[in-house]
Amino acid sequence: MPVLPKAIEIIKNAGYGITTKVLDASYCGVPQARKRFFMIGHINDKDGFLDEILIKNLSDHKMTVYEYLGDSFGTEYYYMHPRSYNRRAVFSIYEPSATIRGVNRPIPETYKRHHADKADISEGVRSLTSKERSYIQTFPKEFEFVGSKTNVEQAIGNAV
């Protein structure tokens, strides 16, 4: 038996009601399209006990980078290195960010525009700094990261 159904069975047999939901962070006040699975149990309750509250508290629209951070990046478009070159890499601040990963690479000199990129690689399009990426992950501006560049990038990528 797969792990999740087995875990749910054990929890339910212990008397818990369970709410399971996949939430997109951009509907929860985070300027990033990042889906995450949540499973919450409450003793002596019915299944789905939090469904109504979760749905009621979701935003009616996705949070954009601009809504969250304004024009603090000083550019309308920015580069985020794609997992593969089959994916776009240039994003607009007027949309939720793609998932922030634990790597932050510069724009390759040989980068060719993907058909879904929001702009050409040109003057003003740049990679985000580690600090800017941390803001998208909702770290407060005064948060100070300690450690190597690799460790800091990994911490930023693993947040949210």
PLM regions with names:
Residues M1-T99, V103-R105:
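Class I S-adenosyl-L-methionine
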Residues G70-V160:
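C-terminal target-recognition/interaction regions appended to catalytic cores
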